[in-house]
Amino acid sequence: MNHSDIPAVALLLSSIQNTFRWKLDYGPWQTEIGGQMIFTDNHSKAGTGIVPVIPNYTEMQAGAYGIQKYRYERTAVEAGIRLDRQETRAGGYDWTGNYYGGNRKFCNFTYGLGGHYRLSKYWELTSNFALTWRAPHVHELYSNGNELGSGMFVRGDASMNAERSHKWITSVSYRDKVFHIRLDSYLQWIKGYIYDEPLKENITVISGTYPVFRYRQTPAFFGGADFDFRFMPAASWEYHLIASFIRANEQGTGNYLPYIPSFHLSHELAWTHQTKSHILFRLTARHKFVAKQNRFNPATDLIPYTPPAYHLFGAEASMECPVKH
């Protein structure tokens, strides 16, 4: 019997979003207040023959905020506060036929302080410190089944709390006709960082055997930087380089956290030429380097090693020709 026309997953998602924003400018000051309300209804459609990995759920989010800004000559500062509330109602039957789900409510107050200063004609400095939060997703709370896209059997934790973090970001940039340079660095302390961890066990269901992962929370520290460099020596030539790295550890133990990207570097050299008839030619050579992740704990991942470092090389040639109508 052919069931190839029946999808493995069929979800009906309905969402209503409302946003309100009001601004007032007076001299060097600007005041902004606003609010947002989002209602989401997610239900799986019957008849697929496969139990969905998450239960049906509805979610109501509401928030209100206020921002005060001040600008004077080279300086700009701002401060903001926000209050959010989220309620999630979930219910369904798992692959064993047992009912599961629940009702969770989250409420949080956050704030942010930031400043921007133009050091000179070409240099700028920006810094921001904020308290942020993220409520756990239904997938992290109530997952209990096989993820069709990843081949993992995932279990949520309905007792998890919201993530709360303090984040400090500082940026320095330089910009003129030839160079565009920007360095962003950040530090982040997270209370209740959420991630999925392998339990080092397998489970067998009708469709096969899968490794079991479970969502958990831990205090974590993140630090990293992003570097963006552009060099335009002539109208036809441009060199662009992007590099990024991140460090992440579990607070208290210092253990490495899983799924953290290793050092990345990508750059390209492009040549463009436009003829008098407006035909545009472009040649590009690219290179990307991804380092091996050595900050790795085999106990918190599915396999006891990380992939080796690798290089990717590419080239592209294109032509754009305008067509008269």
Predicted regions and their residues:
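Extracellular loop and loop/strand-boundary signature of outer-membrane beta-barrel proteins
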Residues: 2-10, 17, 47-56, 93-102, ...
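Gram-negative outer-membrane beta-barrel transporters
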Residues: 186-190, 207-293
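Surface-exposed extracellular loop regions of Gram-negative outer-membrane beta-barrel proteins
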Residues: 41-44, 55, 85-96, 103, ...
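Short coil turns and loop connectors of transmembrane beta-barrels in diderm outer membranes
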Residues: 27-28, 73-74, 121-122, 166, ...
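Residues that define the transmembrane beta-barrel architecture of outer-membrane proteins
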Residues: 12-16, 58-62, 105-109, 164-168, ...
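Residues on the lipid-exposed face of transmembrane beta-strands in outer-membrane beta-barrel proteins
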Residues: 18-26, 64-70, 113-117, 160, ...
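Outer membrane beta-barrel strand-and-loop segments of large Gram-negative receptors
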Residues: 9-21, 63, 155-161, 167, ...
